[in-house]
Amino acid sequence: MLASVITRLRIIETDINRLVTEGGYDRGKKFICGISQPQMPLRLRCGTVFSSRRTGSLSLLSEDSFHSCFDDFSSCLDDPSVRETLTFDRSSLAFYQEGLEEAANGNVDFRKSRAEFCGCDSDVDFAAKLWCLRRAFANIVADEHRRLWLTNAGRQIMADLLRHDGRETREFYSAYDDIIEFVNNEVNHEKMWEELSARKVADLGMWDVLLDFVLLDAFDDITHPPATIIALLSNKFLTRKMKESSLSTVLWTTISAKRRRLLYADGFINHFYNLTLIMTPSLALAFFGGSSDAYRELCQFFKEQVCSFVVEIFNLQNIRYTSLEELTEDLHSSLASRIETLQTRLSNELLPT
């Protein structure tokens, strides 16, 4: 909630500054370069337009229907005055204009549109920004120092979440290091691409794999979990140990069945399942019932930081889409800020005795 308030205050400050310098804005138009954006389908690599929002999900807890986590994090978007587009000259955003041209020509592939969640004007606006962000994320991970920093930060944050649930982290470290080693080995990239493109993932970058495919899909499921999971974890006659044991059994059975259908037994998805078996019991108990209030709030804070980061980086008022270099700088700054916030919160929380 605090992150949402801060995001809104930043937007309001930007609005006031522009009102002073430009003399107001037109509430009735949503234009880019003076041209109203059409709603056009964006093709995927396979040449097909997919309407299903559950396309290629890795989730083990999902129902067939798509459930957005937008409702839980709309506090910074629910005010129409915040969502309205200012009449600043978007033609000055040269890099964004490149993305807009690619999107208008149908050259931006993606697994699912998150235009509404990200606060974009349309699918074309979402695709244009996504085209830019993919290149900025690639710039960040191309830097060895930054890539190592991101790897270590993710390792620390996830391990801390487990520790705050009173869990041993040795098995997690082993599984995490294995998947990082797999991803960093260029020999595996073709295999990884075969696996993920079969699930309609359009790019192997941070947005498509980590944010969209793994985290946001998981948060979608958390918002409206399957009834069977709710029934199990909300049963007051079962102890936490019994709930955890039952959930672990369900996960193991589900993953065993999924592993038999994998394209590669030693591929990316298999490594991801190893992590899932370790992380899911703690997170499921936190979000669906069975954990302490303190741990549930901690996991909710993690979710909020990720979602707020996603909304922020798609906002032209927060991130400079003027050039690849400036977008990369702002994206890295926003990412570093969110990571620092998470690390501070995790380090300040008392570990369970």
Residue ranges with predicted function:
Residues L2-T353:
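Extended, low-hydrophobicity acidic Ser/Pro/Thr-rich
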